[in-house]
Amino acid sequence: MQVTVETKEGLERVLTITVPAANIEDAVNAELRNIAKNRRFDGFRKGKVPMKMVAKMYGSAVRHDKMGEVMQRHFIEAIVKDKINPAGAPTFAPVEFAEGQDLVFTATFEIYPEVTLQGLDKVVVEKPQVEVKDEDVAEMLETLRKQQATWSDADVAAEDGTRATINFVGSIDGELFEGGKADNFPLEMGQGRMIPGFEDGIKGKKAGDELTINVNFPEDYHAENLKGKAAEFAITVVKVEARELPEMNDEFVTKFGAQGGVEGLKTEVRKNMERELAQTVKNKIKEQAINGLVEQNNIDVPSALIDQEVQVLRQQAVQRFGGNADSAPELPRELFEEQAKRRVVVGLLLGEVIKTEELKADDEKVKALINEMASAYEDPTEVVAYYEGNEQMMNNMRNVALEEQAIDAILAKAQVSEKAVGFNELMNQQPA
């Protein structure tokens, strides 16, 4: 077997492989003998049919099949011998082939990029320094009260904290538009659900009031046909309701399944907030470390890996919205391509960190991660036992641990500082 390697643009490689004719003929003849031995032919006893007849009937099809097998086998032998690492399946194309002659074919594919990590000492990470304070717990308890609130008609004007039920009809240049009309629409004032200026027009109004307001749709509004448009809304206030908050007592506590009365609920709420806070802090640090890693290391990405990741994201999108899995390929590629490329880049770079640092999943870290995750459930012991009895779940958790160890390795070389921040400020930050 003769092999030549041609480097194309980027990560593309082309192998030209020559396979001796004898290899092809041996494979074809072996299969024809197998057919002659095991198939029945009219007028012949089993295994007694002449080989020329078998070759005439099946030679072409067998030769075609065996060519594919031979190309696949010799491609694998070639990349193993030359230590080539393909990033996806090759595309085979025969260059020269005639019966009794050597087979010359090409295999076109992409390789994994050679990654040399750099700039880890230039990665900047700001660790949030935050704790759950008594006032944070009190605010969360107040949120729970609001979630359990009841509403009742009141002879009051609409203002923040009340709920106005309205009818409205919207128009642009005198024409009604889709989604611009509603009856008995409940609007909790002060929540910012409507476009800017809409709630302001209703404030101070009472049940039975009619009004007309003029507002502008934001330039970044989700509906393309409404972006930046000036609109007029005719509004009727049907009723205004006041919110009645429940008392913070044992009856209220039982709705949340907490033990130990009001103090028990406070303890449980604080515990949940601290667990959520710890995860958020970890995610913020990880996000900065990965962003810095990507910024400092510009690498080529095999399109084959992006294609694979696009398919994964398509399937996840279909599952998330309850669609038919068969419809996944119909989702436009451009919806996922940028995210897919990012995930491939991050995977390759973290993989190189793991390789360079010679990291292996730490058993104690795996155990700690499982216990941390299980603590959010009613029976943590049962959850831990489930993980420990499921090898696939354990492997998933080992991968999580390995990724965290890679992040720790980045942080060990990065420029890390600390910044004090409030609980709500941190929890309400949008991902970068």
From Swiss-Prot:
The primary location reported for this protein is cytoplasm
Q: Which InterPro entries match?
A: PPIase_dom_sf, PPIase_FKBP_dom, Trig_fac, Trigger_fac_C, Trigger_fac_C_sf, Trigger_fac_ribosome-bd_bac, Trigger_fac_ribosome-bd_sf, Trigger_fact/SurA_dom_sf
**What does this chain do?**
Involved in protein export. Acts as a chaperone by maintaining the newly synthesized protein in an open conformation. Functions as a peptidyl-prolyl cis-trans isomerase.
Domain comment, as recorded: Consists of 3 domains; the N-terminus binds the ribosome, the middle domain has PPIase activity, while the C-terminus has intrinsic chaperone activity on its own.
Instruction: Enumerate the UniProt keywords alphabetically.
Output: Cell cycle, Cell division, Chaperone, Cytoplasm, Isomerase, Rotamase
User: EC number(s) in its UniProt entry?
Assistant: 5.2.1.8
Recorded family membership: Belongs to the FKBP-type PPIase family. Tig subfamily.
Name the chain's protein.
Trigger factor
Q: Which organism is it from?
A: Aliivibrio salmonicida (strain LFI1238) (Vibrio salmonicida (strain LFI1238))
PPIase FKBP-type domain location: 161-246
One Pfam entry name: Trigger_N
